[in-house]
């Protein structure tokens, strides 16, 4: 059974250069990395399957790379190897569709306090963030307003209109496009 893998995982882009149909996003993120002008909170918005989570992972790996090649990760340093092997302690993912309670957010907030051991940043990717309960959003707000210097949040959603305004106002918002046939050719 280990010979089989979901094609979306096998062919998922691993670099900014390999992301399809989102050049406006990837070039902006690459510029931020190269200039050292990183925000503490990002909101990636767009339909399912357009690369929001993929770009979040690529970005998280790139900003933690110890020997970056411009804005791309080297894939050779300890930080990149641990990410590629699924054992990075700096990158945390939360699926808010199934972990949307105040307690889930409090657990995440406890992790925010931990300083990264390898790499520069602790990156928290919250997928389907619009599914958080109102109480969970409110519990998260203080941390999003005043994060530690080592913490970066990347929130991803298919439904931006469900995100409370106080969260929206604290994020750099990136709107992902639908991928067109000509983008993939």
Language-model region placement:
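P-loop/Walker A NTP-binding region and its immediately flanking N-terminal helices
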Residues: 1-173, 177-185
